[in-house]
């Protein structure tokens, strides 16, 4: 009888202990998520400046052999790692536009010339302007396929209106 009473009391104490630890651990875990009050703004010589004006010296111990990985990406290209240190991220890559070759310059000039001749044909509605504009549009490179189709549609719209003799 005494043994059963002691066993039941130990079980109740254990159950109470388990519930209190789970409640406490979930309360602690909920604090880590959500918006952060302090966000790093700049890093200079291992000193991190936060947006509220405070500073913190950061160091990664030499004996820390845990692999380093990115935990969070902040504004201003600042990375926070799993060990609590901060670094600037990699600089963004900018693709420089390729220098235009003579061939591409000539193709662009043909496109511009075709646009000018189509504009002139829209104003005059003459047969000679139509021939010049149609020839120029036909000579436009296939690389400007969409613009070429637009120019051809403009010519067709003028032809629907009729030519002036």
Curated annotation (Swiss-Prot):
Highest taxon in the source lineage: Bacteria
Q: Where is the signal peptide?
A: 1-29
- CC per GO annotation: extracellular space
- Write out the function statement from the record: Extracellular fibrinogen-binding protein that plays an important role in virulence. By interacting with the alpha chain of fibrinogen and its derivative fibrin, enhances a non-functional interaction between fibrinogen and platelets and is responsible for repression of fibrinogen-dependent platelet aggregation. In addition, assembles a fibrinogen protective shield around the bacteria which results in impaired phagocytic clearance by the host.
**Gene encoding the protein:** fib
Q: What is this protein called?
A: Fibrinogen-binding protein
Major site of localization recorded for this protein = secreted
In terms of SUPFAM superfamilies, this protein maps to: Efb C-domain-like
Q: Where in the cell is it found?
A: Secreted
Family annotation (Gene3D superfamilies) = Sbi, C3 binding domain IV (1.10.10.1270)
Q: Which residues form a coiled coil?
A: none
Q: Which UniProt keywords apply?
A: Secreted, Signal, Virulence
Q: Name one GO molecular function term.
A: complement binding
Q: Which InterPro entries match?
A: Efb_C_sf (IPR036233), Extracellular_fibrinogen-bd_C (IPR021033), Sbi_C3_db_domIV (IPR041909)
According to the record's subunit comment, the protein's assembly and interactions are:
Interacts with host fibrinogen alpha chain/FGA. Interacts with host complement protein C3.
